[in-house]
């Protein structure tokens, strides 16, 4: 029987399945951070259980670390306790930890791929909703809750029901300057923020194949924002070239053998999906969200929509509420909306290609008066690479703040946050009410679009910036 990529990955990891029971899956990699793991380790301790496979468990600090100092006390009492607990737990249970002073420390979904922890064909879990990022490698990756974190630590398995399947095909080539962030925002604009609920999404089509691994990670990172369980891109030569030579990747003949298997991880000819969505890449322009969920998104050249234009009464009410929170009036051009802060970072857009794209816009320009702009590399290696290329100097000379790695302003769990009423052009993944700080107003954009907003003081079409 012809199978989708998701079905192949799922079936290959079933440890036990009985009639009327949820299948038990083997988990190849477990990524851990300071926020969702303390109670899980406490549970192990209470029952006298070890970590079943410490060699398949990797930990880092990211969510509530300071991006201005490596001092563990800098982000408040709760953050300090969580980070100290992680240090204690990893030491006690034999788990590798990339702490604040480790050169590999960074956002968990940046660290995993760049260290070769993430590989095609794997099942990967983490107590974090954006674990879907790793699906860019043709791995089945999804977020789990703290009780499930404990279960995986104890057994290296997890009960998981089968999801429905969705194919999202982006046909043709994207125009120059159109990024993976624009593509995925356009997709969510079409499906809505709940369009993928109950599904695992496979992204395909020429525009997807053209993306680098970093672009594919941006894409899969936001699969969760359309309600999907996970996102997938089938592995190909782009994938294999990225993985080769990384710290935890197979070496020599083992790598060749792995590639031979990874090449089978494609959806079979004739396999059927429960849902199919198609977009034309050439129609996608730079995207900016205007509301309070990622599906409320328009082209940078559009006007703020009028809630009355929505036929669905639920959508209409949602738009009215969103505009009130965002302090926007229907009909005004998006390019006239001024911003207060810019955040370039997060597990969506903090990799080296993202920073290069932002630096290209920032070079030779200055951050607009009254705007605070942060650039937060996703990991120690990304920061080192950017500095080797002189990107930090470009940003600093333009008036951006060059920070230490961490989740930063993506979420209000550390010192980087919005004040009430402040408007931010952000390369992160969520624009919910209060996500970046109580009363903060978030607009999701690509790194180049964020840099353009920083230097102009408002949203601007990067295609018009020479």
Curated annotation (Swiss-Prot):
<comment type="subunit">
    <text>Heterodimer of LeuC and LeuD.</text>
</comment>
<feature type="binding site">
    <location>
        <position position="410"/>
    </location>
    <ligand>
        <name>[4Fe-4S] cluster</name>
    </ligand>
</feature>
<dbReference type="GO" id="GO:0046872">
    <property type="term" value="F:metal ion binding"/>
</dbReference>
<dbReference type="Pfam" id="PF00330">
    <property type="entry name" value="Aconitase"/>
</dbReference>
<dbReference type="InterPro" id="IPR036008">
    <property type="entry name" value="Aconitase_4Fe-4S_dom"/>
</dbReference>
<dbReference type="InterPro" id="IPR018136">
    <property type="entry name" value="Aconitase_4Fe-4S_BS"/>
</dbReference>
<keyword id="KW-0028">Amino-acid biosynthesis</keyword>
<comment type="function">
    <text>Catalyzes the isomerization between 2-isopropylmalate and 3-isopropylmalate, via the formation of 2-isopropylmaleate.</text>
</comment>
<dbReference type="InterPro" id="IPR050067">
    <property type="entry name" value="IPM_dehydratase_rel_enz"/>
</dbReference>
<dbReference type="GO" id="GO:0003861">
    <property type="term" value="F:3-isopropylmalate dehydratase activity"/>
</dbReference>
<keyword id="KW-0100">Branched-chain amino acid biosynthesis</keyword>
<dbReference type="GO" id="GO:0009316">
    <property type="term" value="C:3-isopropylmalate dehydratase complex"/>
</dbReference>
<comment type="pathway">
    <text>Amino-acid biosynthesis; L-leucine biosynthesis; L-leucine from 3-methyl-2-oxobutanoate: step 2/4.</text>
</comment>
<feature type="binding site">
    <location>
        <position position="347"/>
    </location>
    <ligand>
        <name>[4Fe-4S] cluster</name>
    </ligand>
</feature>
<keyword id="KW-0432">Leucine biosynthesis</keyword>
<dbReference type="GO" id="GO:0051539">
    <property type="term" value="F:4 iron, 4 sulfur cluster binding"/>
</dbReference>
<keyword id="KW-0456">Lyase</keyword>
<keyword id="KW-0408">Iron</keyword>
<dbReference type="InterPro" id="IPR001030">
    <property type="entry name" value="Acoase/IPM_deHydtase_lsu_aba"/>
</dbReference>
<keyword id="KW-0004">4Fe-4S</keyword>
<dbReference type="InterPro" id="IPR004430">
    <property type="entry name" value="3-IsopropMal_deHydase_lsu"/>
</dbReference>
<feature type="binding site">
    <location>
        <position position="407"/>
    </location>
    <ligand>
        <name>[4Fe-4S] cluster</name>
    </ligand>
</feature>
<dbReference type="InterPro" id="IPR015931">
    <property type="entry name" value="Acnase/IPM_dHydase_lsu_aba_1/3"/>
</dbReference>
<dbReference type="GO" id="GO:0009098">
    <property type="term" value="P:L-leucine biosynthetic process"/>
</dbReference>
<keyword id="KW-0479">Metal-binding</keyword>
<dbReference type="InterPro" id="IPR033941">
    <property type="entry name" value="IPMI_cat"/>
</dbReference>
<keyword id="KW-0411">Iron-sulfur</keyword>
<protein>
    <recommendedName>
        <fullName>3-isopropylmalate dehydratase large subunit</fullName>
        <ecNumber>4.2.1.33</ecNumber>
    </recommendedName>
</protein>
<dbReference type="GO" id="GO:0005829">
    <property type="term" value="C:cytosol"/>
</dbReference>
<comment type="similarity">
    <text>Belongs to the aconitase/IPM isomerase family. LeuC type 1 subfamily.</text>
</comment>
